[in-house]
UniProtKB/Swiss-Prot annotation:
InterPro entries: DUF1806, YojF_sf. This is Uncharacterized protein YojF.
Length: 116
């Protein structure tokens, strides 16, 4: 993965617009949060292979970035993204990591279902 270049990510987001895609969205404080301080609560949200069609996509901010995908029924939104890549399967993979390198958020878009 490399640091987000807004124009490149915006172009990638637009390539998937107006057709069915699969979304992976994950955010986590990780179990390490409670492990390091038992008063901290572990917080996780995880969605894999949600099939959606979005009609508008925007990347905003100056880093970390936020991405919004406008669907017919509402929005998919991810904030805290710092890196991205388009892999050999043409999937757009975006992530945000905490200063120590631990994953904080991931938003991935694919034309095919992700492996489970």
């Amino acid at each position: 993965m490399k640091a987000i270049i807004k124009e490149d990510v915006q172009a990638s987001l637009e390539r998937y617009a107006d057709r069915p895609v699969y979304i992976h969205l994950e955010t986590t404080t990780g179990s390490y949060s409670a492990h390091l301080n038992e008063k901290n609560m572990t917080v996780v949200a995880y969605i894999r292979n949600a099939k959606v069609t979005y009609h508008q996509a925007k990347i905003k901010g100056n880093g970390p970035y936020r991405v919004g995908l406008k669907t017919e029924e509402g929005w998919i939104y991810a904030e805290g993204l710092t890196e991205y890549t388009v892999d050999e399967e043409n999937r757009l993979l975006m992530a945000g990591h905490l200063p120590g390198g631990k994953l904080a958020i991931s938003l991935q878009i694919s034309e095919k279902p992700f492996t489970v």
